[in-house]
Structures are given as structure tokens and as C-alpha cells.
């Protein structure tokens, strides 16, 4: 389990319900949990040479310092703006990027069964992974398609100078 620390303190936000009263205090969520699960033991410990020989992805993209930081069970990452993204519950692309780099190789395929605004697809593309996304809400399908297309355009456009 990874604890995503979204904010430190209340940052001026107020949890209405019974402000400054014991009648009905509402807790303000400053963290969320990311559950890491696998069927059986999570083990992709085939040697690089065996993976390469069998045509399987084998290249890591994670920096050693990032690996050490990201294998801690708390990640402090600022939340994403719902208004800016256009989705009521967006998360920053940094969250799936870290998970993708920790648990997959370059060239692997990432599955996102709840695509929402497309953050995981964008993170997968930026880290050299393939992705498959699913979303039931047609509005979010259109949003994700637009955001992925914009990310592809930015990804393919060389920086000036």
C-alpha cells in the first residue's frame, strides 16, 4: 500500500457539516491509498537476457534515486485541479507514472479499466509504454481522447532552439 499525501494541513479548505462544533464534524481527506496487489507473488525476476531472448520487454526507465524514493510507502504529490482537467476526481499524472516505472518495463502494456481523463494513458506514453484504456462515460471518453491527442502532439513536437 502506498499513501498518497495530497496536502499538508487544511490549506484554508473547510469541511462544512458542523463547523467548529462536535455536532457533525466532517473529516477532510488529505491522503488516499494506492493498493498494490497481485495474484500470487509479484515476481518478474527473469534475467534480462532471458526476457530479451524471449522477446519480452526488459528495459527499466526508472532512475536509481527515484527507485529509492518511490519504494517508500508515502508519496507527497500535489493534487490535480478538477477544473483544469475537466473531471471531478482527477489525480496527477505523476501517480501513475511512478507506478508504471516501478512495476513495468519500457514496451510493456498498461491497462486502465477506469480511464477517466486519461492520466494513466498519458503517463504510459511518456514512459515508453503502450496502454489500453476503458471508460463507460461518453463524456470522459471524449475528454480522455482529446487529452491523449494533445499529449501525443506535445510529445512529438521538438522543443525550439
Label for each model-derived stretch:
Residues 1-143:
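Core catalytic lobe of class I
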Residues 145-161:
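S-adenosyl-L-methionine
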Amino acid at each position: 500500500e502506498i499513501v498518497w499525501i495530497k496536502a499538508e494541513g487544511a490549506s484554508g479548505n473547510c469541511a462544512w457539516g458542523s463547523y467548529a462544533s462536535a455536532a457533525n464534524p466532517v473529516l477532510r481527506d488529505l491522503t488516499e491509498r494506492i493498493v498494490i496487489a497481485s495474484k500470487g507473488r509479484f515476481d518478474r525476476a527473469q534475467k534480462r537476457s532471458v526476457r530479451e531472448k524471449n522477446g519480452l520487454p526488459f528495459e527499466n526507465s526508472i532512475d536509481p534515486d527515484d527507485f529509492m524514493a518511490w519504494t517508500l510507502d508515502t508519496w507527497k504529490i500535489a493534487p490535480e485541479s478538477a477544473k483544469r482537467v475537466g473531471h471531478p476526481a482527477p489525480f496527477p499524472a505523476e501517480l501513475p507514472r511512478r507506478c508504471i516505472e516501478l512495476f513495468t518495463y519500457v514496451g510493456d502494456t498498461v491497462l486502465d479499466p477506469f480511464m477517466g481523463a486519461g492520466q494513466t494513458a498519458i503517463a504510459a506514453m511518456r514512459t515508453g509504454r503502450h496502454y489500453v484504456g476503458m471508460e463507460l462515460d461518453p463524456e470522459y471518453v471524449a475528454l480522455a481522447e482529446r487529452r491523449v491527442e494533445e499529449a501525443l502532439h506535445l510529445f512529438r513536437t521538438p522543443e525550439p532552439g
